Amino acid sequence: VKWWQGVSLWWVVGGGTLAQSLVVVYPPPRHTTTSDRIFVIGTAPLGGDVLVNGKPIGRSEFGHFAPSFPLQLGKNQLRVSYGNEVIDLTIERQKPALPPPYPAQTVIKPPGELVCFSIPAPPGAAVEVTNGNWRMELSPVSQRSLPPNSAVLTHRATQGETVSLYQGCTRQAISGKYIYKIRMQNQIQTMPAPGALILREKFPTIVVTTDQAITRSGPGTDFSRLTPLPKGTQAVVTGQEGTWLRLEYGAWIEQKDTKTIERATPPHSRIRGISSRNRGGQTEVLFPLEVPVPISIRQEERKLILTLHNVTAQTDTIFLVENPVIDRLDFQQTQPDRVEYTLTMKTKQQWGYTTRYENNTLVLAIRHPSTRPKVLLDPGHGSKNDLGARGPNGYPEKDVTLVVATLLAKELQNKGIDVVLTRSGDEDLFPHQRAEMINQIAPTIALSIHYNALPDDGDAENTEGIGAFWYHPQSHALAKFLHDRLTDKLNRKSYGVFWHNLALTRPTIAPAVLLELGFMIHPREFAWIVDPKSQQQLAKVLAESITEWLSKSSF
């Protein structure tokens, strides 16, 4: 994932001549940010000084630069000059957006459920929220804002600024539009909440209409992902915020991934005998149900734990077919409406799993280790619409990922490993299309090849190294092994190994890792990234590491 986009290129693809000798790739001439600093990425020929606001900046032996500068709130001017060439940059630093008054969108709840109203207001104010004759006074709360998730990538994941909020909770709210009144120094300001509150006694039952529908911990894409729901899953809705539905077991799902169905009773099921079968290089465990119910899956070392929601066990018999992956299957009714199944594995490494409903039977398919490994390589980005990060001279990430992935594919093929590339040219592929290719091809492992950049508050001049990103526990060992081997054998710095919710790390069908093989924006590391001999050496070491890991992990 790249956090910035640069200005139009001053270079010609394929190694053409620069139109001018001073190049600033980032930030664009006019840029808006909430960061308290900004880095400037660019290059100029050696033999002269590059100045920013009249002061010389450090450059690499290749002439590249990436200094950072503090930003004040409002407009900031940076003048980058080299000889007679001048590039002016205007960076506007804005305050982070304050949370809107609640409800920010239409909220539907059952009567008697706790409703918490809140609004930002200056300290010392008197604040109340009203709805016709209904009113409630709110109390001041001094609250620290959370840093963005991207702050982990710049090692600045500390709490943000203090926000002055006024809050109050009640179970006696009424339906309608709410208006906030803020009294400050004998002045009254009124502010309507953007959304409305609707109290509803009855809620519908929905069925999931898309394959592996996304569920989250809250009503929006800012909330964490939970286990996707297979197509056909049925559940009762218990609330709604905007276009997000809250399901009975606690997860939220977008309304567009569902449709309302008529049911006389809530979708609750019993479960009795459980069976299994070997089919197509995997062991399928079959859970016959009266109705397709929501599921949750948790993966641990040597364990895969499946939870069936809205289910009561009547199980007396379980048959586990002889197979190379699952050692034992146990279950426990952990709550009156929840059954937990623990699959204990024979080996430490798990090779992927999928879920689907066949009518009312949940099929949990556990993949066997491959007798002939197949590696999917995804060269990150592609096409003029998705350049990725760019080096100091404007060279795009999309081109170097394709070069390295192609070299790596040849090295792996020479070792007898089957390889599939998500792209072999300049195709324009969205991340979800690449992830779907992983699901369709079902490789032994999937590697997405990338090169790195930073958010605006990063230290571009001093951040370099190889990083690896994983999401499911089955991918952690691969990410750690490749990261450690590359940093050791190539004598490269470590950026780190990260758990990260990325499209190319989320597929469950195979261990999937996203590699960031260096920083495009780093003045010195960029030279290593684009050096043909270094690219060949990287491909060779990476192929050897993949082969070794596959050999060690298959038993």
Predicted regions and their residues:
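Gram-negative bacterial Sec-dependent N-terminal signal peptides
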Residues: 1-20
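Short linear recognition/processing motifs and adjacent strand/loop elements at protein termini
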Residues: 3, 20-29, 33-34, 47-49, ...
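Soluble non-cytosolic domains of exported or imported proteins
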Residues: 34, 109, 219, 223, ...
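Extracytoplasmic/secreted envelope proteins and their assembly/folding machinery
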Residues: 75-77, 88, 250, 402-409, ...
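Sec-exported extracytoplasmic/periplasmic mature domains
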Residues: 234, 406-417, 439-443, 474, ...
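Active-site histidine-acidic residue metal-binding/catalytic motifs
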Residues: 361-437, 441-445, 455-458, 462-464
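Solvent-exposed loop/turn segments at secondary-structure junctions
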Residues: 381-384, 395, 425-429, 451-456, ...
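Active-site-adjacent mobile loop/cap segments within catalytic or ligand-binding domains
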Residues: 441, 445-448, 452-456, 467-470, ...
